[in-house]
UniProtKB/Swiss-Prot annotation:
It is found in: Cytoplasm. Interacts with traf6. This is TRAF-interacting protein with FHA domain-containing protein A. Pfam families: FHA (PF00498). It comes from Xenopus tropicalis (Western clawed frog). Adapter molecule that plays a key role in the activation of pro-inflammatory NF-kappa-B signaling following detection of bacterial pathogen-associated molecular pattern metabolites (PAMPs). Promotes activation of an innate immune response by inducing the oligomerization and polyubiquitination of TRAF6, which leads to the activation of TAK1 and IKK through a proteasome-independent mechanism. The gene is tifa. Keywords: Cytoplasm, Immunity, Innate immunity. It comes from the Eukaryota. The keyword Cytoplasm applies. Belongs to the TIFA family. One of its GO terms (biological process) is innate immune response.
Length: 177
């Protein structure tokens, strides 16, 4: 009998890549507990915490401006669907968490889009999800950026262009037209 028929097909893991930036990224203590550029497998039922508490958080962010537990990530499967996703929940009472431009207060949670910017305090985290087909575990890979991930684009305000050549508004009686 052919042995290839008995071999399980290998499933790909969903991978969440988190590129992190902080203005004081040179400070060795800030990201000391995070192994950069290494994928870490995480069981699907695990809740992954980020924050200042080294004993509770799998990914410690050692800054006085970060809450003890800032936020957590959790892998889940949609109801009546085989696709998996990752949700983020703000666990900080003092710091708001922003996912793209959506503000999350304490205990608010949302599903992470495939690519988004997570911000709190001075931290910027670019999150990119590569979907896999395994629902038993997923991977997180952390990268460190030395440049800001948020680009402030200055767009000068444009002056409106009048349709009829006059720069000031002119009132016209509706019967005078």
């Amino acid at each position: 009998m052919d042995e290839t028929l008995n071999v399980d097909t290998e499933q790909t893991l969903t991978c969440l890549t988190l590129t992190m930036y902080h203005p004081n990224h040179q400070d060795q203590k800030l990201f000391r507990g995070i192994n950069f550029s290494r994928k870490e497998e995480i069981k699907a039922d695990a809740v992954v915490a980020f924050g200042r508490d080294y004993n509770v958080c799998r990914y410690p962010l050692l800054s006085n401006r970060v809450s003890r537990i800032q936020f957590n990530l959790q892998f889940f499967k949609h109801f009546n669907c085989s696709t998996t996703a990752i949700e983020i929940k703000n666990l900080s009472k003092k710091n708001k968490l922003y996912v793209d431009n959506l503000e999350l207060d304490y205990l608010n949670k949302i599903e992470l889009p495939p690519k988004c910017m997570i911000r709190f305090g001075d931290f910027q985290i670019l999150a990119v999800i590569e979907r896999g087909d395994c629902d038993e575990k997923f991977e997180i890979c952390c990268e460190k950026s030395h440049v800001s991930l948020v680009q402030d684009s200055f767009i000068p305000t444009m002056q409106p262009i009048p349709e009829c050549g006059t720069l000031n508004a002119v009132e016209i009686d509706e019967n005078e037209y």
